[in-house]
Amino acid sequence: MDHFSTVLQRPPHFDEDGTEGRGDRGNGAGPGPAPPPPPPRGGLRDILNPVSSNSAVQSQAAAAAPPPPPAVASSSLHGIAASVPPPSSTNSMRATPHSSSSFNLRSPTREPSEYRHPLSSLATPAPFAASPPTSIANANNTNNNNALGAAGSLSSQPPPPPPTGPRSILNPPTPSQQHQQQHHHPNPFVAASAPSLPPPPSSLQAPPAITPIAGLSAPAPASGSLPLSAGGIGNSITVSSSSQPPARASQLHAPSAYYSPAESFRDRDSSVREKSSTGGSFYDPTAEASNGISGSSPRKDRDRDRDHRGTTRESQRRSVSGHSDTGSSWRNATQTSASNKTRDPYNYSPSSADYYNTRKKENYPVDNTTSSSIAAPSNFTVATRSPVAALSHPASIAAPASVGSLTGSISPRLSLRPPSMASPTIRSAVLANPTNGTTSTALPALGRNDSPPSKMSPGTSTNPSRAAGVMSFSNILSSSEPVPRPRATSPNNPDDDDDVPMKVERADSSEKVVKEKKERKPRQPKQPRISDIRHSESTPKGRRGSTKQESPLPNIRIPAKRMANGAPKQQKTFSAENEEKIRKAMDRIETRELPHEDEFEEELRLWRERREYKRQQMNQRDLRQRRQRRADYTEVEAQKLKLHADFGKRRYDDLNYDDALQEVRERELFAEKERKKDMQRKRRREKSMATTMEAKAAALARASAAQDEAERQKYMREAERANKKVQQTRLILQKGIKGPSRNTGPIEPNLEGGTMATFQAENMEPGKTKGKGRAGARPKKSKEQKQAEKDAAEAAQAALDAGLELPPKEETNKIRIKLTKTKAPKEADVDKDKENKEPQEPKEPKEPKEKVIKEKVVEEPKDPLELKFQSKGFNQIYDQIWRDLARKDVNKVFRLAIDSYSTKSSNLKKTAILASKEAKRWQLRTNKGTKDLQARAKRVMRDMMGFWKRNEREERDLRKAAEKQELENARKEEADREAARQKRKLNFLISQTELYSHFIGKKIKTNEVERSTDHPDEIAAEKDKIPENEMDIEVPTGPIGAKVTNFENLDFDAEDESTLRAAAMANAQNAIAEAQKKAREFNKEESKLDEDGEMNFQNPTMMGDVEIEQPKLLNCQLKEYQLKGLNWLVNLYEQGINGILADEMGLGKTVQSISVMAYLAEKYDIWGPFLVVAPASTLHNWQQEITKFVPQFKVLPYWGTAGDRKVLRKFWDRKHTTYKKDAPFHVMITSYQLVVSDVAYFQKMKWQYMILDEAQAIKSSQSSRWKCLLGFHCRNRLLLTGTPIQNNMQELWALLHFIMPSLFDSHDEFSEWFSKDIESHAQSNTKLNEDQLKRLHMILKPFMLRRVKKHVQKELGDKIEMDVFCDLTYRQRAMYANLRNQISIMDLIEKATLGDDDSASLMNLVMQFRKVCNHPDLFERADTASPYSFGHFAETASFIREGSQVTVGYSTRSLIQYELPRLLWRDGGRLHKAGEDNQVAGWRNQWLNEKFNIWTPEHIRESLAGTDNFSWLRFADTSYEEAYRASHKDLFARAVEMSTKKNRLAEIKIAYDEPEDLNFTPAHALFHIREREDRRPLAEITEQGILGSLMNVSRSAFSETGLGRLEQAAAPKASAPPIEVVCDSRSAVVERENIMFNAPMRKVLFGPTLAEEKALVVQKVPPSRYPPPALLPAPDKEKQKFTNITVPSMRRFVTDSGKLAKLDELLRELKENGHRVLLYFQMTRMIDLMEEYLTYRNYKYCRLDGSTKLEDRRDTVADFQTRPEIFIFLLSTRAGGLGINLTSADTVIFYDSDWNPTIDSQAMDRAHRLGQTKQVTVYRLITRGTIEERIRKRAMQKEEVQRVVITGGSSAAGGGVDFSGRRAPENRNRDIAMWLADDEQAEMIEKRERELLESGELDKMQKKSRGGNKRKRGGAGGEGKEVSLDEMYHEGEGNFDDGGNNIKGSGTATPNGAAGGEGGDGKGAVGGAAKKRKTGGSKKAKTTKQRLAIADGEIDI
């Protein structure tokens, strides 16, 4: 191979090693003595060690290594057969990357190796070092680079030991470890195949204290290594130990563990190797010493295998005898190749191998057939192994030459095929060292010896090389034993041929050694370690003596070793004594017993499982391949068939296209006719329904006007019938017309099975689709028609009777005719009549005819001509035609036939009757009385039957009605009893609460504080007011009763309520006691305060009527009502009661709460800790006010990032519950979001006082902030809110429960009572009576203090509220009407009455209507538009890169380009262009412009005289030179010249205006008629006055009409630059640029610039020399100019909205009067539009909405307050309505109002609050006649509700408040529907509600709806469970807690892992903390509805 170092080597000869050119060839020796002949089975030449140029020096160093000490020498021979020094130490192959470390088995830690080979970095991993990189040919080629070694050829040459310690041929590795090395990651403890290095220094050798086993094994080294496994063991020049893993002798075969085991030594070896690998433990040489000599085997096994082992041993000896040189053969070869000199082989110092062979070699028998070709790394020390291991890995049987097997293969059958797959690591291992050829293997072949051994030619017994060396292995192993007879081959299992490894037999000479070792080392069978030798089989007992002579081996030419001079080298031989010693040692080794083979059952089972798995894999691969082949074949055939199918389809289409087209057209025509008929039917039904409804209304009117009850019932029945008819007609209209299904597909699913086609066919059967009592398509005959027919028959009969009178009523036959006629269509089912077996009337003869007709109808589609056409397409079309006929036409024809038949039959019957009467007329005279009697009897019987049936039916109906009434009454009674019980329970709960409130109210005197006022008018009104009735209950002084918590013990069914009253009293007392106890014990641990007197706050009962003065710490003066509020708050604190300060907004709730904290710090020395929780927008406001009012307080602003808050938490003092003045902080201010985020830290603190600002944020008891704050350890809580009630009573309950959890959470019924919303409570009664109002107000009074501005603040004027109504514009009306047309009135009524859960669709309609009312541009914005530009523009990657001044060049070009070749454009293509290639360029100019030109001066001069051609020039004022120049100038130049030429003739008309000079014209200008009559000079001198207007009438009219300022009505669809000629020539580009960018032409068109004109004036250039003015006229459109880009008009933007137009007028007036405006919006998009409007009007403004950051909010508010030039403040209603002081504004405008009046009240109180000195005016813009009017009406209703509940007074209507406008929460659709409906529709909704309520259907429907909603809500879960009306109404609007600030969420500092808080990412009120806990850490952004709901506290986060 070219990448290996080459040396002078002898090429290998054919058949020199006995392989006949097949298999691995032996190592060819280089120049030097001829090597001895190899063994008959072929020498294993080492192809792994090429000789490099630098190998000589290292080889000499290795040879000159000092001999080891005796301890080492005693163990060195142990590795004779396995340890071989490197041939020149070329490359050291290492096992793993851990090659620089050695591992001690006793202490498996890495130790640095003291010896490292210089080339060790080129090592290859061990698992692949022994694998041949190439095929056999490559192996043969590689042989030239290898030296023949004794071990490599299985010769007797003794190799030196490895440098890391002794190796033993008795310590082979397990195949499982080998398998692991080959197929898994490299083991760091496995040695690599590398040349053995020189012996290490003595410090690395084994200590002499460890003795070998039986004197044969070397002592274990100090740094033992892992046992190295190998399958078979053989010697190679690169092998250092027999314990080295052979690791895949060839890539052509699988590892040994792959092959099937057999009951042989090979099977046991394989199982041992596999089992040892599973253990995974380190090898312990001490344990191996005892386990190595164990086990026994029957002697018959030894007898059976003796012959073959003898043969193997003889072969070994003969091969070794031919190589008796002590390792000098390969060494000499290497050195010779390196030095290129002939050298004397005997002048060298003995090598380490020679040294080892001369010391105690009689004690180290060697089995050369078990050597490995893999060398251990230089830094590994292999532990001494037992000799039994060598026998457990038997030598391979020499394969016959005819097999051609590889010597190093371990496969049972050795083939020469290339490897099926090579591991990438193997390839990398092969190529790791390009100079190393040691990648082959020298393992003995383990193939089965299926061929008889007789084919092997015996070797010669006389070998001259025996005398070469006495101590050589050739003399030791060679003997004269004859070759044993061949062993019978075992039968091969055809399934397991490739899986069974070969057996290897052992010699019998090891029996003595086994006994000897048993004496020295007893066996330890219970050793827990997993040992390779433990599981091996014992040596067979019977063996043939080793001294027997074998048959002569076949003659093989063995190359003789040669000396330096070329003469043959004499071989050394062993003495007889040494040979006898060696033979005895080998006998002792072979007689050693092996473990029993039964111990390998588990390994056998595992091997079989792997074999089965491999077989399954192969089968699956074959199956996949077969499937792939089938699929490919199918695809090919399908392509072929597809061609034929396509051809057939095309041919069929060509043949049948015309017929199919005609059929389709006819079908479409028929369908159109049917559609028209359906529409006619629909219109008739609608008209009939309208008529019926009118009849119903008339009947109802008559019923209401009727006086008699019977008459009223009659009219009511008529109305009911009409109503039923209307309902039926409506149902028909909704479900469609029942008939042929023309509009439904044929394969639409049918719920009853089958398809729609079969379903329709069943429905379309004749006889089943006919209506009840219908004979045909004609309408049923009325009674009058029938009576007329009867009268006609009677008249005919009378005429026949010749005047004889017939009886007055002859009904017998008439009745029979009637029955026959009406019953005939019903008796189509003959089978039914047969089953009933009833007597048939004379109508029976008609039945057979009907049957015949039906049979014909069924058989009609069967046409015999159909059988002639068998094509599929024809049959499909044919079947479709007949199917359509059967579906549509057959039924119609059948009905026509039936009608015709019935008419004919009726006529025939009548004729027959008349005929019979005429025939029997003579009998009538005698039988007339009898027949009359019979007829009357039949009629009477029929009437009686009808009467009794009707009577029975009425009785049955009455009975059912009575039963139903009884059930209804029972249900009502049960409901009444339950209601009474619930009422008593509710009364008990309310009484308990009332008692508690009464006791507290007496102490804290809330009523007195509320009534206090400083307004004189209010004081007078209070005096005149009648005091309310209050509870007069004495406080019990006796012992407190037991608290009742189990309500099941109370009897709520009893009438006596004394027990309940007593229990309520006890519960109220216990609640008070618990509150007081909690207040006492809060600071009990460290409270050392004054415990005497009235000021002891820990004794709440001792507080008297003490007036508290204003604290001195407070740097402001409190007003009187604020001081009373302070007293009330202190009183609450003393009693341990929490409260709600609900003063109206703007009355100073903040300063009152600050004064409480100052009072506690001043009086009781309680400086904290105080906690203030406020919305994010008011945090800075709180901090500023606390610092301003109480500077002594240390305020800790707790917000910022997670890291900032972590630092702030260091100031917390959790050890003390009461802070002193020197505490780190006194008041902490934070937001609701951070409280939830860092709830774990807040709950660890004990807070003296917690103040919640804008407490409506916790109005939802389901929100996480409510739950978190409720769990804080606080002595007192104070809620600040200006609107305690916002939507319903459930929110109020949430606040009350928060301040008193022990009372208001006493039972679930109390919560349910509040949550049911008192507005809709009281047994479906919508009136809340006075008693309930008073009791509710009594509950609220003690805990809530509320004052309004008009009572307490006389200097604050009232606010004036005005509703400004606006009209819809034309565009708004069109859009509003379009939306209204999309609303179904019926759906609206149904959703409003039934409470459907689908509120999103209705609210979406509400949002659309609101957008229309606000501005139409909210739907579709009129943006800047331009036509489609059909061109290309240049682009730039970044304008920033272009700089501040960007040069925009003309880069536009059309997408259409006219490309011309350069040949046409430049190279002579254009004939008039001169050039090198154009020889005719000047012809046109020469002849046409010069010679043939008639305009030359010479020709003109000659043609001037007389009447010649140019005689007219004398009258045109033109010279012949001017005419010549004009003919040679282009059109543009002539136009410019004419524009600069002065018209003197027109001025003559102005100068000479006398009559005689009127028509004067100079003679030389007689032809200048236009110039003479030009009026332009006259118009130019008369620019002003009436004359100027008359002279410039077009210009003045155009300017006055404003056409130039109008917007363009039409715009072009597209625009494109001119098409350019493209040519690959620079001249073409220059020419095009000269045309497009002609500077003189542009100068003439556009005139001089302003700078040039200025320069002309400054330079005083005379006007005559001025450049010509701009010839390009001014554009007609002043704004649009010459461009087609249209910009929307702001004027239209204002006028498109009625609100904006009205606001425009209002703002102009306010601006003139000096007002400042707060403008509130519900939609942020409307704020965006308003910004554009304000910019258009040049109004200064600022903006604040939910997206504004916290610091920006603060700065924006400060700017508006301090800068008067800012006219308008744009705010979002919900974002700008909390905690902002905007008193500098005196006008509030609501662009659109909120449906919740509380939101608007908060917004307007931003200006109407303390500090306001002006009159506040509030304007509401309401669009008339739209949804906004109804929303405003609903808001006023809610405002009344709140006023009544808070004040407790009566409403203006008296007798209670009408809450009919508010339904239950689950029917919020009614509110939305009432907004959408107009007055008439609202009336219909209420009427429908009343009807359902009276009938009882409303409750059923609502219950059903609630059940479905519960399931839906249960499935939804989480925060989507309850979506309030607020959330849907305010969709898209921001608010304060909507993010947009820089407060980051908690990160690593938050223990819950909650990140977020008040994050600025817009994630809502509570960052991502709880959201992450809910959703598992998802960072998905919340929707707008979720953020708004979180901000309001509606839903949990």
Swiss-Prot record:
Domain DBINO: residue ranges: 881-1006
Enzyme Commission number(s) from the entry: 3.6.4.-
Catalytic activity, as annotated: ATP + H2O = ADP + phosphate + H(+)
Chain coiled-coil ranges: 666-735
Biased composition (Gly residues): 1954-1967
Domain spans labelled Helicase C-terminal: 1702-1858
Helicase ATP-binding domain location: 1130-1302
Record's compositionally biased regions (Low complexity): 49-64, 118-156, 203-230, 240-251, 411-420, 689-707, 794-806
Record's compositionally biased regions (Basic and acidic residues): 12-25, 108-117, 264-276, 298-317, 500-519, 529-540, 709-723, 782-793, 824-858, 1891-1902, 1919-1933
Top-level taxon of the source organism: Eukaryota
Species in which this protein is naturally found: Neurospora crassa (strain ATCC 24698 / 74-OR23-1A / CBS 708.71 / DSM 1257 / FGSC 987)
Primary localization: nucleus
Gene Ontology molecular function: any one: ATP hydrolysis activity
Protein name as catalogued: Chromatin-remodeling ATPase INO80
Biased composition (Pro residues): 32-41
Domain notes: The DBINO region is involved in binding to DNA.
